Amino acid sequence: MVIKEYGGGMKRLAAVKSGEIKATAVNEPLASLAREQGVNVLVDLVPDQIPWLFTGIVVRHDDISARRDLLTRFLKASIEGNYIALTDEKRAKEVLAKELNITSAKTLDITYSDFKQQSPANLVPTTAAAQNILKLFPDASQKVGDYVDMSLLDALKNEGFFTAMEQKYKTQ
């Protein structure tokens, strides 16, 4: 099996349908569109409860210390935005509909449900999810710590930021 970058979701879906590629990973709303178009879904990470990292914040290692204040502010804003999305369904769906060009209420409901089930409120990646990604690259180091630096998130936890978000958005 060869794993390579192939472009955006719509391009990958078209390539699967044409036979140009054999399989691709998609999440909502493309997963629903793929099903509607008769594409066979091999794995659905949500109902199968498979830990996965769908997105991440990537910076050069040196920038973690050199630009720590900027990165901390960025993380705080991203985390609070995630709390808003998880606790204000109407607002989150408006953003999803606009940014992903979703016009179907059913697809919007599925997409939001998928997001809620997969997105940790505090954006902390799980070790299991990172390990599942690393398994795709057996020749690379399988040590999560070689790729994931938790120091900024650990600092936010230690300063009480996560607790403050839980209280503000009444998630605990």
Residue ranges, per PLM feature:
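Glycine-rich, flexible loop/turn motifs
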Residues: 2, 38, 53-55, 60, ...
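Short beta-strand-to-loop elements that line the ligand-binding cleft
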Residues: 1-8
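Secondary-structure end/capping motifs
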Residues: 65-143
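Pocket-lining segment of extracytoplasmic ligand-binding domains
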Residues: 11-100
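Generic structural "secondary-structure junction" signal
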Residues: 8, 59, 66, 125, ...
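Conserved C-terminal helix/tail region of periplasmic/extracytoplasmic solute-binding proteins
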Residues: 138-172
